[in-house]
Amino acid sequence: MNSLIFGKQLAFHKIVPTTAIGWLVPLGNPSLQIPGQKQLGSIHRWLREKLQQDHKDTEDKDFFSNNGILLAVPKKKVSHQKKRQKLYGPGKKQLKMIHHLNKCPSCGHYKRANTLCMYCVGQISHIWKTHTAKEEIKPRQEEELSELDQRVLYPGRRDTKYTKDLKDKDNYLERRVRTLKKD
């Protein structure tokens, strides 16, 4: 218990980083040591002396100064220019040009080789949606009702401005740009 408290004091005074405290705990506890093992009291003495020296010195010393440890941490945000240089710069990290473009046999637009033409896929999905849409089947009771009775019995919903704006998808959804036709 004593060594645990002592380790926290060391971390507080920046003599030993907090990640190194874990190996200090078994050193002070004799019950955790192997019977033939030497007592390691000299380490505790050295750490106590170091702690007392820091109390004597009024200067706040950093554990990492002149210790040969360099902390590699970015100090500033990477600029837009540096990002572009990495992205488009020389080497294997450079963006590659797409050279494997072919002509779509059905519509004649550019497409990547060994893939489907996105324009044709969009057309097929549109056809599937229109043909598979189910028509609403009205019950027989509603067929005989007049228009006034239907309005009284089933007032329906009134769309708010928000729902009307949501239904107008052309304003906020970006459509896929059609590729150029190959000449």
Swiss-Prot record:
GO BP terms in the entry: mitochondrial translation
Targeting signal (transit peptide) range: 1-71
GO molecular function list: structural constituent of ribosome; zinc ion binding
Keywords linked to the UniProt accession: Mitochondrion, Ribonucleoprotein, Ribosomal protein, Transit peptide
Cellular component per GO, a single term: mitochondrion
Subcellular location: Mitochondrion
Residue sites binding Zn(2+) per the record: 104, 107, 117, 120
InterPro entries per record: Mitoribosomal_protein_bL32, Ribosomal_bL32, Ribosomal_zn-bd
Listed result of changing residue 120 to S: Impaired processing by the m-AAA protease
Post-translational modifications reported in the UniProt record: MRPL32 precursor is processed by the m-AAA protease (composed of YTA12/RCA1 and YTA10/AFG3), which cleaves the N-terminal transit peptide. Cleavage by the m-AAA protease takes place prior to assembly into the large subunit, an essential step for mitochondrial ribosome (mitoribosome) assembly. Proper processing by the m-AAA protease is dependent on the zinc-binding region within the tightly folded C-terminal domain of MRPL32: zinc-dependent folding halts degradation initiated from the N-terminus and triggers the release of mature MRPL32.
Family membership noted in the UniProt record: Belongs to the bacterial ribosomal protein bL32 family.
UniProt miscellaneous comment: Present with 1700 molecules/cell in log phase SD medium.
Function: Component of the mitochondrial ribosome (mitoribosome), a dedicated translation machinery responsible for the synthesis of mitochondrial genome-encoded proteins, including at least some of the essential transmembrane subunits of the mitochondrial respiratory chain. The mitoribosomes are attached to the mitochondrial inner membrane and translation products are cotranslationally integrated into the membrane.
Subunit organization: Component of the mitochondrial large ribosomal subunit (mt-LSU). Mature yeast 74S mitochondrial ribosomes consist of a small (37S) and a large (54S) subunit. The 37S small subunit contains a 15S ribosomal RNA (15S mt-rRNA) and 34 different proteins. The 54S large subunit contains a 21S rRNA (21S mt-rRNA) and 46 different proteins. bL32m has a zinc binding site.
Protein name, UniProt field: Large ribosomal subunit protein bL32m
Organism lineage string: Eukaryota, Fungi, Dikarya, Ascomycota, Saccharomycotina
Name of the gene this protein is made from: MRPL32
